[in-house]
Amino acid sequence: MSPDCLDEALVAAAQAGSSEAFSRLVERHQQALRAFLRRACGNWAQADDLAQETFLAAWSRIGRLKAGASVRAWLCGIGYNKHLSAVRSGARDRIREASYEADRETARGADAADRMALEAAMGDLPVEQRACVALCLAADFSHAEASEALGLPLGTVKSHVTRGRSRLLQALGGPDGR
């Protein structure tokens, strides 16, 4: 069974009230959601909290998920909205004590200094731009999937990715020399 067909079957079962099916959906998508939220907010502890809030909200809204819709994009959209709510409420400022020592996982091929520089540069991007970059460049979402997940027009997502990439390259001393 293809991953999309499995998701559709699990969604149908969860919509019928199966908490086991929803648990399987959580298992299948939690890594991608947490990775996106970690890049979007720059704080692992906050990202994990937001992921939990996202899954709670998703369970209560599972009936609203349309047949054939991308579960991953739907969850990232809910997570993004949770992140925006946290930013608006000032939670980011209260939580933003950057504990880089807690971040023991390193990005593939990048040492700790490179990872910290990337996290700092991502943190300097505007919220929507950061979310687009995190989804399209780090989580391998297509522009269309990111547009669906974030509720932004496709052209806006493309612009945010292009500008975000440029700003990251500039901040990190990238090859384009800008």
Predicted segments, located by residue:
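A short pre-motif secondary-structure segment
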Residues: 132-136
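C-terminal edge and immediately downstream basic/flexible tail or linker adjoining helix-turn-helix-like DNA-binding
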Residues: 1-2, 13, 42, 120, ...
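N-terminal module of bacterial RNA polymerase sigma factors
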Residues: 1-32, 39, 123, 170
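Structural recognition of an alpha-helix C-terminal capping motif at a helix-to-coil junction
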Residues: 35, 49-56, 60, 69-81
